Amino acid sequence: MNIKNLRLKAGLTQVELAKKMHVDQAAVSRWESGETKPLRKSHKRLAKVLGCTVEELLKEGE
């Protein structure tokens, strides 16, 4: 997943993304580091918040 790149492209901070996803900033940090992944059921919402498709979200980091 390339969440960090997509987040930066969307002009969001980790805190802003966390608020939009109803999680804490630490969760976003763990997603970006690859320590954990967002739940499958939240992929669609995350893609919408980041302004991308689910396919773009799930692509390996570039």
Region annotations inferred by a language model:
Residues 21, 25, 61:
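Short, small-residue-rich loop/turn micro-motifs
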Residues 22, 41-56:
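DNA major-groove recognition helix of helix-turn-helix/homeodomain DNA-binding modules
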Residues 13, 24-27, 39, 53:
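Short coil turns linking two alpha-helices in DNA-binding domains
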Residues 56-62:
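Short amphipathic recognition helices of helix-turn-helix/homeodomain-type DNA-binding modules
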Residues 2-20, 45:
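Short basic helix-loop element that most often maps to the first helix and adjoining turn
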